[in-house]
Amino acid sequence: MDPSSIDLGSIPGGSEQQQHEDGAAAAAGSPKEVFRSQQSLGLITQRFMSLRQRNEVLNLNEVAKELNISKRRVYDVINVLEGLGYVEKVEKNNIRWIGDNNNSEEQNALEARVEMLRQQEKLLELMIRDAQAIIELHFEDPIERPYNYVSKEDIRKTAEPNTKSIIVKSELDTSSSFEIQVTDPSTSGSHDMIVRNKNGVKSHALLFTNDPPEYGDEEDEDDVKKLSSQKRFETSEALRVTLAEMLTDPTTISSSPKHIKLEEPEEIDTEDLETFVLPPSTSASQSNAPYLPETPGRGLFFSPFKSLIDPCILPSFSDDLTSGYINITTPSRATGAGAGASGQEDEEPVSVMDFFSD
């Protein structure tokens, strides 16, 4: 058939004029187009969901009347919702909502768990900040600085046996970042490791095996451990009287002097007395608790926390050791009415032991 012989006007909607008229009618919002848009499945579902908020059990006949749609379209919506697990049929022409309640309970449980995890995260962040502050204070304390090191034995305890460790040491008080490069062993037949300091700070590297040291017997091992402990802390026997014992029995100091052993301390420059403060665990408000120095032979230590107590507050035992109280005095100042009358101040001590003498 010749295409030119086809009459386009005989085809419904085939002519350009007819198509233009249909488009104009649709644009003007003809009743036919409005009715078809109202019968769309998406719009019916939205209207159907608004009815569901009024009553959990719905009658399909009442729904069809209220929405002014055919019952067939209502069943189309119900079949979709039933397939998704939101509704179930309880009686003839009656449905009940089931999906929303289950999802609500599950959602509430998930939200509660998220809130709990959020609180735990905040707690961990606080703990991390506290730990970082403690570490910073630890490195600032000049008494603790000599002990800021890691021994080979500490590394061997955490490393796998029969392996090797590379220790990189930088200069003190430097923040360095390192990069490690490992070459391809296919060319050289071995792994070549290059450790480079990105900041250009001078560093030293040490390679040692993680094999545990061999001892002849258990006694030798115990002797080595004792010797290592003495060498690390470089202290003799410390004070053995604990705070708990003193609180329960205030006469511990006088009745059990064998527990206390004080060695003659080093002489302290009197100009540095203003920089000595009480240990962090002891404050002027806690002066009623018995005080014993934890640092062997010293009892007082240089600390960056000078601003906590001003002027210099030094503890000294009272004459009555059984009372369990501490006198907080400033040795560099005159004490008592007799000193004021004589116009002379007490001589500054040359040893910390002078503060603990009766």
Swiss-Prot record:
GO cellular component, one term: Rb-E2F complex
Principal subcellular localization: nucleus
Region: Disordered, residue numbers: 1-31, 331-358
Localization terms from the record: Nucleus
UniProt keywords, alphabetically: DNA-binding, Nucleus, Transcription, Transcription regulation
Inactivation phenotype: Reduced level of constitutive germ cell apoptosis on a ced-6 mutant background, in hermaphrodites. Blocks DNA damage-induced germ cell apoptosis, but does not affect associated cell-cycle arrest.
GO annotation, biological process: regulation of apoptotic process; regulation of DNA-templated transcription; regulation of transcription by RNA polymerase II
Short name of one Pfam family: E2F_TDP
Keyword Transcription carried by entry: yes
An example Gene Ontology molecular-function term: RNA polymerase II cis-regulatory region sequence-specific DNA binding
DNA-binding region in chain numbering: 36-99
Family from the record: Belongs to the E2F/DP family.
Stored PANTHER family: TRANSCRIPTION FACTOR E2F (PTHR12081), TRANSCRIPTION FACTOR EFL-2 (PTHR12081:SF101)
Function of the molecule: Transcription activator. May activate expression of the pro-apoptotic genes ced-4 and ced-3. Required for constitutive, and for DNA damage-induced, programmed cell death of germ cells.
Protein name: Transcription factor efl-2
Organism expressing this protein natively: Caenorhabditis elegans
